[in-house]
Structures are given as C-alpha cells and as structure tokens.
C-alpha cells in the first residue's frame, strides 16, 4: 500500500483525479442492507444466547443508528478524512485477502511480498483509511486485527515516507495519529462486512460428511471475528465522537 500511494504522489494527478468518483448509490438503503444480511447471518448462530448478543450490538441506540445512517456513511467516504487533515486519494475499495496475490520465494513457497492487488471495479477517490478497515475487518481474526491496529498506521507512514525520500519527495502531510483517528469512524461503517461476507462463503457450499465438522469450526471462527468487530465498533460509537449523526 505504501508503494501504491508513493506512485500516486509521484505521478501527475491529472491521470486519476476526477476520473474515479465514489459510487454514492452504494450507501443508499442501508436499513435494508443491514436487515437482509443480518437475517441470513442469524441462521448460522447456534443458540438464542448468541442471537441476543448480536441483536444487542446491531440494535444498540448508538451503534445501530450509525451503521444504518446513509448520511454518516457518505460523510466517512467523502469528507471525514479531509476533516482529519488527510488528502483525498485513490482507494482500492475492496482490499482484502482474496484480492491480494503474494509472490513465491526461491523455494516456491508463498512469501510476504505482494505481487498484485486484484479486482479494481470499485476504485474511487476518497478516504485511504477505508482500505485499512476493509483489509483488517475482512481478513483478520480479532486478536490479529487488534494487534495490527497498534502499529499498522505508524508502519504505513514510515514505509511511505521512506519510499518518497528515495525519490526526492517530501513526507506526507499527515501522521499515523491522524490516520488512526479517522479509522474509528471508518471502522464503524465496516462493521457489517464480517457479517455479510460469511453467508457469501457458506450459503452455496455443500459439505461432505467428512467436511461437516471442519466447516462448522470455520463458521464458529467467522462468528467470533464478527463478534470482536461488533465489540470494537460499539466502543468507538460510545466514545461520543459521532453523536451528531444520531439525530
């Protein structure tokens, strides 16, 4: 990501600026979006207790309103980063592990080096923090995501500024702290992603008898990932920073 944003900062912005508007229509009818995917998600919960837990998050007086607010979602993708002092840039829009190809090392094993990002169909000009939120909520278990959140923005800014220095460019005009502050609002908007992606993985999958218990364990893991996302989103919603969007 640092290399990608270095290339953007080094190229003539006329190449991309004004050519990839945000598809605002994606954020219409969020009430129907939340209701439809959560209804399907509930079919994977094995007990009334788990259903009650998720109901408490998705119908929370603050969090429940924010994830259904079209105006809040539009603010996040079009303006929140500017208010935080982060310039508008190109955003992949669907950056998660299934859309990343990694290089192989000399032994043919998968390395940590990225070969390419795939699936640019919703590339847009907006808040670069959206790519962090999509990547972390959709690709990581709760413990890994939470650990990554403690250092990922510092690491990104350090890598990006190193890339820029190598080509004689000035550092970016924002800090890791600004990215992290913007991330809280973006994270709330991404709450539903671990919930709606699970039915996409399992709804059409038929398990053999040998696979049944394996898939059950995978479903449990996805549920836990969604639960941890809900816990953190509620913490951000309860901070009071976004209360103006509750009216």
Place the predicted regions along the sequence by residue.
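Catalytic activation segment of kinase domains across protein kinase-like and atypical kinase folds
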Residues: 89, 96-138
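ATP-dependent phospho-/nucleotidyl transfer catalytic cores
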Residues: 3-92, 102-111, 218-222, 226-233, ...
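A generic secondary-structure signal for well-formed alpha-helical elements
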Residues: 1-12, 156, 160, 164
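Short, flexible/disordered secondary-structure transition segments
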Residues: 11-16, 146-147, 163-171
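All-alpha amphipathic helical-bundle segments outside canonical DNA-binding/catalytic cores
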Residues: 168-189, 221
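Long, cytosolic, alpha-helical-rich C-terminal regions that act as interaction/scaffolding modules
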Residues: 184-246
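Active-site activation/catalytic loop segments of kinase-like enzymes and analogous catalytic loops
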Residues: 122-166, 190-211
């Amino acid at each position: 990501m640092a290399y990608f944003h270095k290339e953007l900062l080094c190229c003539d912005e006329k190449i991309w600026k004004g050519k990839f508007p945000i598809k605002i229509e994606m954020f219409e009818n969020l009430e129907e979006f939340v209701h439809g995917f959560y209804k399907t998600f509930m079919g994977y919960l094995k007990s009334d207790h788990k259903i009650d837990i998720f109901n408490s998050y998705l119908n929370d007086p603050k969090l429940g309103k924010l994830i259904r607010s079209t105006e809040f979602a539009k603010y996040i993708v079009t303006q929140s980063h500017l208010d935080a002092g982060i310039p508008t840039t190109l955003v992949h829009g669907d950056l998660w592990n299934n859309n990343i190809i990694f290089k192989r090392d000399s032994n043919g094993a998968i390395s940590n080096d990225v070969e390419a990002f795939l699936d640019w169909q919703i590339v847009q000009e907006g808040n670069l923090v959206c790519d962090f939120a999509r990547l972390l909520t959709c690709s990581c278990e709760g413990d890994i995501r939470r650990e990554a959140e403690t250092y990922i923005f510092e690491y990104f800014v350090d890598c990006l500024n190193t890339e820029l220095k190598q080509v004689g460019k000035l550092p970016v005009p924002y800090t890791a702290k600004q990215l992290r502050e913007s991330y809280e609002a973006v994270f709330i908007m991404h709450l539903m992603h671990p919930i709606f992606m699970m039915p996409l993985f399992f709804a059409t999958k038929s398990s053999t008898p040998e696979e049944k218990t394996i898939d059950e364990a995978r479903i449990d893991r996805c549920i836990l990932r969604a639960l941890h996302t809900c816990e953190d989103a509620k913490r951000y919603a309860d901070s009071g920073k976004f209360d103006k969007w509750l009216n």
